[in-house]
């Protein structure tokens, strides 16, 4: 017995769709390197450790290179292939850590580290992708901390003066009440004596 035949439906993948998928896969393979930078601008303060985070996709083992572009020119920071030791420039030795995904971490940044950081991921000659991250490093404002310290010292001085004035007022009120009680006792005893004399 034959299985029933479905009219209008085809089973399996149509040949045209399969050809489209193969063509798309080949186009994607020929593109080479894809680079993703989640944060293109980073603000930091002095002495902070900063992660310049990136991620890439490629088919082979790429060469990753980071360059620093301050106001006066271009300076190479590091170059490496994932899984191999990094070639770190003398200016950033002991200040940079590399990761296999292409990210780098800068330790103890200073204002001089502000600028553009350019990453270039190269799979083979002619197949590369570049991206840029802007790093702005600012100093901690000690003048602001000084102002806050002076303000709190002034508040403490005002509090001490107010507490002292309250203590003086309390002592004056206590003396005034004592004096009033003493006068009241004197007048009461005087009245009692006068009543005794009149009797």
From Swiss-Prot:
Keywords, ordered alphabetically: Cell membrane, Cell projection, Developmental protein, Glycoprotein, Membrane, Signal, Transmembrane, Transmembrane helix
Membrane topology listed for this record: Single-pass type I membrane protein
Transmembrane segments: 147-167
Xref: InterPro entries: CD2/SLAM_rcpt, Ig-like_dom_sf, Ig-like_fold, NK_rcpt_2B4_Ig_dom
Chain spans, region Important for CDC42-dependent filopodia induction: 169-185
GO CC annotations on file: axon; dendrite; membrane; plasma membrane
Any one Gene Ontology BP term: filopodium assembly
Location of the Ig-like C2-type domain: 36-138
Positions in the Cytoplasmic compartment: 168-199
Source superkingdom: Eukaryota
Gene3D superfamilies given in the database record: Immunoglobulins (2.60.40.10)
Annotated glycosylation sites: 43, 87, 101
Span of the signal peptide: 1-27
Localization, UniProt: Cell membrane; Cell projection, Dendrite; Cell projection, Axon
Modifications after synthesis and translation: N-glycosylated.
Keyword Membrane tagged: yes
Topological domain spans for side Extracellular: 28-146
Assembly mode: Can homooligomerize through cis interactions within the same cell membrane.
Stated role: Cell adhesion-like membrane protein of the central nervous system (CNS) which modulates both the position and complexity of central neurons by altering their membrane morphology and dynamics. Involved in the formation of neuronal dendrites and protrusions including dendritic filopodia. In synaptogenesis, regulates synapse formation by altering dendritic spine morphology and actin distribution. Promotes formation of unstable neuronal spines such as thin and branched types. Regulates neuronal morphogenesis and migration during cortical development in the brain.
Protein name: V-set and transmembrane domain-containing protein 5
Organism: Rattus norvegicus (Rat)
């Amino acid at each position: 017995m034959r299985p029933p035949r479905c009219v209008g439906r085809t089973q399996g993948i149509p040949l045209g769709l399969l050809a489209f998928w193969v063509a798309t896969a080949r186009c994607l393979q020929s593109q080479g390197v894809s680079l993703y930078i989640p944060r293109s601008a980073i603000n930091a303060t002095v002495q902070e450790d900063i992660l310049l985070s990136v991620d890439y996709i490629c088919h082979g083992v790429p060469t990753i290179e980071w360059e620093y572009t301050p106001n006066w020119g271009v300076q190479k920071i590091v170059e490496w292939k994932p899984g191999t030791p990094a070639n770190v420039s003398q200016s950033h030795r002991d200040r940079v850590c590399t990761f296999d995904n292409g990210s780098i971490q800068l330790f103890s940044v200073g204002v001089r580290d502000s600028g553009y950081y350019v990453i270039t991921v190269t799979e083979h000659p002619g197949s590369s992708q570049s991206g840029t991250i802007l790093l702005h490093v600012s100093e901690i404002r000690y003048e602001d901390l000084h102002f806050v310290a002076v303000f709190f010292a002034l508040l403490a001085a005002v509090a001490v003066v107010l507490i002292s004035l309250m203590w003086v007022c309390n002592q004056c009120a206590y003396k005034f009440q004592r004096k009033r009680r003493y006068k009241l006792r004197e007048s009461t005893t005087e009245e009692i004596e006068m009543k005794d004399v009149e009797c």
